[in-house]
């Protein structure tokens, strides 16, 4: 009888908890750790945690990045990561520094950074770092490591947010990522392929097999090939509205937002 009574009390407590917390949905809303994929004429990736914001971008559209920052009300960015070096990189950094508050900037290489930008970052006390020798960033719920791809001006980025692993790669990064030897566990839950139009799908398949992602977000025209591998597929540029992806069945929110629907976060 005592055992039945105890079990009944536990059941009631569980039921009340579900009613008040609203199940996984309420828990997800309370979770401060998010990974957001946004399109504002420039694909930007925002990692957020308690008091920590990391913005990752391709780095070739100043207006798109600034629009995303304004719409998402990003008043302070702890780390800005530009995944590739473009002709517009200098202009982007200057505009970014003047219109937003950033503590640290990460580039694939410091070669090509103008003296004007170097002076400006020194004046504003902003640290500027390179991926060439490898880069590590570790905070309470966000960790990130990046490495420059040899013979190119691009970088490959691996991040972990609340134990969810994310890889940010482009066409130039495929071969390097497949042969990674300096990262013990290359498996990722989310694979983000930026600005990739590779005609040969073999490299993509090898990369997917190597990293074994649960979710792929890309702009490749090979959805069918990837779907055959049993991986969920999203095309960021064609996505409509707001999507919430549940990864590993846990209560973490990963947002795919599209500018086309006129979505503005509150």
Task: For the regions a language model picked out, list residue spans one by one.
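Short, aromatic/basic amphipathic alpha-helical patches
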Residues: 68, 92, 96, 113-126, ...
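Active-site metal-binding motif and surrounding structural segment of the metallo-beta-lactamase
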Residues: 61-108, 179-217
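Sec-dependent N-terminal signal peptides of Gram-positive bacterial secreted proteins and lipoproteins
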Residues: 1-28
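Short, polar loop motifs at secondary-structure junctions
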Residues: 42, 109-115, 133, 219-224
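Core dinuclear metal-dependent hydrolase active-site scaffold
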Residues: 22-79, 128-187, 193, 199, ...
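Short loop/helix-cap segments at secondary-structure boundaries that form the rim of catalytic
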Residues: 29, 47-48, 97, 115-121, ...
């Amino acid at each position: 009888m005592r055992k039945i009574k105890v079990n009944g009390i536990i059941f009631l407590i569980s039921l009340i908890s579900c009613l008040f917390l609203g199940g996984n949905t309420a828990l997800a809303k309370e979770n401060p750790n998010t990974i957001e994929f946004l399109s504002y004429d420039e694909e930007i990736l925002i990692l957020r945690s308690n008091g920590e914001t990391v913005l990752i971008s391709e780095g070739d559209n100043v207006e798109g990045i600034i629009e995303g920052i304004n719409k998402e009300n990003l008043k302070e960015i702890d780390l800005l990561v530009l995944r590739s070096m473009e002709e517009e990189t200098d202009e982007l950094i200057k505009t970014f520094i003047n219109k937003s508050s950033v503590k640290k900037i990460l580039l694939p290489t410091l070669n090509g950074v103008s003296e004007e930008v170097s002076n400006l970052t020194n004046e504003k006390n902003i640290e500027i770092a390179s991926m060439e020798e490898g880069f590590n960033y570790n905070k309470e719920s966000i960790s990130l490591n990046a490495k420059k791809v040899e013979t190119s001006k691009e970088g490959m980025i691996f991040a972990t947010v609340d134990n969810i692993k994310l890889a940010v790669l482009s066409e130039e990064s495929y071969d390097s990522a497949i042969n990674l030897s300096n990262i013990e566990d290359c498996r990722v839950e989310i694979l983000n392929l930026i600005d990739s139009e590779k005609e040969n799908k073999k490299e993509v398949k090898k990369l997917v097999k190597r990293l074994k992602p649960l979710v792929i977000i890309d702009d490749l025209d090979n959805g069918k090939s990837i779907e055959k591998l049993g991986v969920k597929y999203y095309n960021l540029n064609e996505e409509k509205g707001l999507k919430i992806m549940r990864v590993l069945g846990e209560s973490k929110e990963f947002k795919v937002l599209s500018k086309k629907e006129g979505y503005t976060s509150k």
